[in-house]
């Protein structure tokens, strides 16, 4: 499976993943809104928005 793995508004990059899901985490801090993308569907702390999906590059 292919997931996007670029940070925030960086140009799109992808990585091959062993599992069948991708994630997109979104949160805000003193730098503004931060977006992190990658493989799997991790546990997140309170205050972090998590979206998990199950198709190639679905987390862009």
From Swiss-Prot:
CDD domains: TFP_snake_toxin. The keyword Transmembrane does not apply. One of its GO terms (cellular component) is extracellular region. Pfam families: Toxin_cobra-type. GO terms for molecular function: acetylcholine receptor inhibitor activity; ion channel regulator activity; toxin activity. Expressed by the venom gland. Keywords: Acetylcholine receptor inhibiting toxin, Disulfide bond, Ion channel impairing toxin, Neurotoxin, Postsynaptic neurotoxin, Secreted, Toxin. The lineage of its organism: Eukaryota, Metazoa, Chordata, Craniata, Vertebrata. Belongs to the three-finger toxin family. Short-chain subfamily. Type I alpha-neurotoxin sub-subfamily. It is found in: Secreted. It comes from Hydrophis torquatus. Binds to muscle nicotinic acetylcholine receptor (nAChR) and inhibit acetylcholine from binding to the receptor, thereby impairing neuromuscular transmission. Disulfide bonds join 3-22, 17-39, 41-52, 53-58. Gene3D superfamilies: CD59. This is Toxin aagardi.
């Amino acid at each position: 499976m292919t997931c996007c793995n670029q940070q925030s508004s960086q140009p799109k990059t992808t990585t091959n993943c062993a599992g069948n899901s991708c994630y997109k985490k979104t949160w805000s801090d003193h730098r503004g809104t931060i977006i992190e993308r990658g493989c799997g569907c991790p546990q997140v702390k309170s205050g972090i928005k998590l979206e998990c999906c199950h198709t190639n590059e679905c987390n862009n």
